[in-house]
Amino acid sequence: MKVNSKLLLLIVSLCGILTILSFRYNSFFDLVATTLKRYTEEYPQEKIYLHIDKPYYTAGEIIWLKAYLVAGSHHEPSTFSKAILVDLINQDGQLTFEIKLSADLGFAEGQINLPDTLHSGNYALRAYTSWMRNFNNAFFFEKEIKIWNPGAKLSNQIAENNMQLDLQFFPEGGNLVEGIRSRVGLKAVGADGYGKEVKGIIIDQQGTFITAFESNPLGMGAFEFVPEDGVTYFGKLEKEDAQPFPLPQASKTGFVLNITESHEHGDVLIRIQTNEATLNKSVALIAQCRGVLEYILQPDLSDNFALIRVPKDKHLNGITQFTLFNGQVPVAERLMFIDQEEQVTLEITPDKKVYSPREKITLRIKATDKNNQPVQGNFSLSVLDAKQMLLNPNAEHITANLLLSSELVGLIENSGYYFNPENEDRKQALDALLLTQGWRRFVWQDILAGKWPALNYPIQQGINLTGTLQDVLSKKPIADGKVTLLSNNPHLVFLEAISGKDGRFAFHNLQFYDTADIFLQGTNKRNRKTVIFEIDPLDKPTFGRTVQPLALQLTDYEKNYLERSSERQQIDASYTFDERVIILDPVDVLGEHMSDEPFKIYGKGSRTIRTSEIPGAETFFHPYQYLQGRVAGVQVVQNGPYWNISIRGSAYSSVGAGTKPLIMIDNIPIESSSLESINPLGSINPRDIESIEIFRGPEAAIFGASGANGAILFYTKRGKYRPVTREGAITFTSIGFQAHREFYSPRYDVKQPRHIKPDYRATIYWNPNIVTDSLGNTTLDFFTNDNESIMMGVLEGLSFRGQPATARFSYQVEKR
C-alpha cells in the first residue's frame, strides 16, 4: 500500500488529556475518565504473590511460604483483606490441603505440612482472598510445584517426546485488514501446555509461499505481511507432514494498530492505519495502566495513517493497555510493557565468600531505589543447597508476577525471563508475549455500559461463620430467632446474633488461630429451644485448569535431591531428641494392663490405624485427618465445618444404597443423618483417638445393611464415649488462621545434644520476615550445614510503597 507522506505527529503535552480534542468527543472522554476512576475506587484489585522456600519437595516435608498481598494500581500492601486462603491441589484438580493466613498490613507467613503418604505428582499452589472472588478466578495466584514420594510409584506420567503442537496466530491490534501491512504474533504450545520452539512458513490457499517465521525458545514470535483481497492464509511447520494452521481472515475495512518502542529514548511510537474502504474514521486512542488513565488521543486519519510519539514518562511502570475506539466501540487493542526501572535494588553482602561446615554467616542487606535512596520494605529469604536444587534463572519472582503475569490470563511460562538482564532478547521476547495475550481484568463495553462486577464476596478481615436457623420439626427458617456463640480460643468469646426473615444469621471477622471449639445455642422468638442449625459449608472456588503430570525423566539435580531426601529420612529415624524429656529412675508398677481387644467387639478390620504412629498428628484438628490420604480407597473431603467421607468400591450389595460408610465411636453408631451436617466426631479432640478400624466389602457384612458402604470405627483412649445432646445447640470445631511456626535454624555456636545429628538439609535457611530500616539496611545471621556445596540465596519482597524487589547471591561451603 502506498502511504501518503503526510504524517500526523502528536506530542503528548504535560496535561493528562490533549488540548486538541474536539468538542463532540468531550462527553465520551469524560465518561471514560469518570468510569475508570469509579472502577479503581469501588472495585480495587487485590493480588497475591507467594514466595516459597524451594521449587520441589518430597512427601513429609514442609512447604515454607510468605504471602504478599497488594491492592490498587500501585501495588501497595493491602489494608483491605486480612484473610488469605492457600490451597494445595493435586493433578486431578482435587483439594489436598488448605490453610488460612492472617495478613498483617499485607504480609503473612505460613507453612504446609505435606503428608508422608502424598502421591508423587505435580501440584498447584493457589492463593486468593474472598474479595478476589468477585472477579475472574484466573487472576488468583497459582504456581505448580513438584512433589515426590520415594516410597510410592509415580503415576500419570507424561512422555517428554509427546510433541503434538497447537499453533495460533494473533494479528497486532486484533485484526487483519486487506491491503495494510500487519504484524502477526504466533504461539506454539505442546501437549504439556508449554511453549515449543518452531520454524515454518506462511502460505496462501494455493500453497504459494508468502513469508517465513521462527519462534523463540518459549514458542512465540512475530512476522509481517500484507493480506490481499479474498485470500486465505495458513501457517505450516517445517515437518513435511505438518498440518496447516489457519490465520484469521482479513477484513475489508477496519483499523490496524501498531505500537513499538523507540530505540533512541524509549518513547512509545503508535501507528494507526486504515484504508479507503473504511468510511467512519473518527477514532480515539485510550491508554490506561491498572485502571489509571494515562492519556486520551484523537488522531487525524483523513490520510488513512497517523504516527504518534508519546514520551516514556507519560506511562506507569508495567503493562499499558492501548484501546482504539471508533465512536464508542473498541476496534483494536494492544498491550505494551513500559519499563520505568522502578524496581528496588537489593545489595546482599555475605561477610565471606567461602565458609566451613556449620560456620556462622552474617548477611548485610541494603535496599535502594533507582535514585540510590534508601527503601524500607518487607522481604523473605531462602538459602538452598545448589547441588540438590536447580534454581531456574528465569523462574517467576515477585517483580515478574506483579508487573506481568498477574495482569494476564493463563500460564506465563518462565516469566522471570523477561526481567533477567542476561537475556539479551528479553525485550523482543516480551513484545512477542504481549502480542499473543488479551486483556481480561475488565471489558470496556461492560464498564462503559455500567455493567459492574457483582460483589457477592465481601472483604474478609477474619473468620466468618454463617448459617440458617430452622424449626426442629418443619425445617422452615426461623425469623427473629437468637443465636448465641461461645468459644474459648484464645479467650472466652460470647456473641449474639438475630436471624433475619430467611432465618439467616452471621458472625463476621472472628479472630482465632489453629482451631476453636464453637458452641451455638439457638432459640426462636418465643425463647424456645426447638431449633436446629444448618451451618454453611465453605464455598470453595473451582479449579478450572489442568495440572500437567510429572515428566518421566528426572534431572541430575532432582535425582541428587531425592537421594539426599532418603538419607535425611534415615537420619531422622535414627536420631530422636526431645529436650523436654526428664529421665526418671526405674519404678515397679503393680497392676494389670487392660487390653483394648475385648473392647473392639467387631474385631479387626482390613486396615488398622494406630494414631500414635501418625507423624504430625499433633497438628490435627479433626479425627478424619488420620484417614486423609493414608488409606487407599478412603476419600476424605473437608468443606468448611462439613466433612464428607466415602470408601470407594466398598458396597457388597444394593442394600443401604448411598455413598457414606457407617461411622462408630467406641462401638456407638453415629446416625447417618448427622453426617449431612456437623457430626459428633467434630467435638472430639483428635488426640483422644487411640485407633481406627476400617471395614470394607464382605468384611463389613457383620454390620448388616448399615455397612453396605463399609464401616469406620473410631476408638477413644478412654473407651467411654457417649453422645451428648443439647436441645437447640451444637458443638463443633472450626478452623482458624494458621498459627505461626518458626523454621528451625540450628545455632551451632551453642552446643546441644541434637547437634550430633548429621545436617544435610536442602533448605539451609528460611526467613519470611526481614524488614529494612529507614536507611534501607538490615543484618541477619545463620549457620551453614554439613553439605559441601555452593549455596544459593533468593531474596524477594516489597517496599512499603509497592515496589517489588528480587535478588540472588551465592557462597561456597568446603572443609578447610
State where each predicted segment sits:
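N-terminal, cleavable Sec-dependent signal peptides of secreted/periplasmic/extracellular proteins
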Residues: K2-I583, A805
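Short, small/polar-rich motifs associated with maturation and membrane association
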Residues: S302-N304, G318-Q321, N326, P330, ...
